[in-house]
Amino acid sequence: MKFILLWALLNLTVALAFNPDYTVSSTPPYLVYLKSDYLPCAGVLIHPLWVITAAHCNLPKLRVILGVTIPADSNEKHLQVIGYEKMIHHPHFSVTSIDHDIMLIKLKTEAELNDYVKLANLPYQTISENTMCSVSTWSYNVCDIYKEPDSLQTVNISVISKPQCRDAYKTYNITENMLCVGIVPGRRQPCKEVSAAPAICNGMLQGILSFADGCVLRADVGIYAKIFYYIPWIENVIQNN
């Protein structure tokens, strides 16, 4: 229940809008759609048996769907729907904070890797400010969050400095294990998108979205879990599970 309450706070709806200029016709092959009985999340395939997402996506009856572009289209040809064995969130994650908002999902069976389903590369070095990143997730263009999102979109935005991020989010504690990506001041138009969008920078998965006041697909500043910081934890979980 606490996870659902946090999720509701992260997904308060205003008017909904989307930008067709950002719509893409095919899914980044690492991108995973996590469907639940509440609201969906994005995830990233990092191993044939493991998906990484935000810890606030620990939601009821989660279903892992790979190779999907439009979730509402049941006729897509390259879907893989896989059950999960367990969800492991970071031990320091708390529902009262956006810090350590990261979780691993172990699949029941290995994903079949092909042209439409591939692994994302994990980073083994950090990145500097002004690095350009590609952020992808699904967007709603109707005022009904209980329907499936209508379009998959990608936007290219850059990493900003910690001082800029702290200025954008004065009431949040921006720690060294967070990454901020977007344009300041942002909040240019209302929107609604699927949470936990990944940030791919220089071909590496550098961030998983924890929170944004607005929408990252509109280049509003998002606060991401910095994946590089969590590499030891990720490797340990996969090795021991």
From Swiss-Prot:
The EC number on file is 3.4.21.4
- Family, per the entry? Belongs to the peptidase S1 family.
Name the encoding gene, please.
Answer: PRSS58
Mind listing the UniProt keywords for this protein, alphabetically? Disulfide bond, Glycoprotein, Hydrolase, Protease, Secreted, Serine protease, Signal
Q: Which GO terms describe its cellular component?
A: extracellular space; secretory granule
| The keyword Cell membrane is assigned to this record | no
- Is Metal-binding tagged as a keyword? no
UniProt name for this protein: Serine protease 58
Attached carbohydrates are found at N156, N173
Active-site residues are H56, D101, S195
**Residue ranges of every copy of the Peptidase S1 domain listed in the record:** 18-239
- Major localisation: secreted
Query: What PANTHER family would the database entry show?
Result: KALLIKREIN-RELATED (PTHR24271), SERINE PROTEASE 58 (PTHR24271:SF56)
Q: Which reaction does it catalyse?
A: Preferential cleavage: Arg-|-Xaa, Lys-|-Xaa
Disulfide bridges in this chain: C41-C57, C133-C201, C165-C180, C191-C215
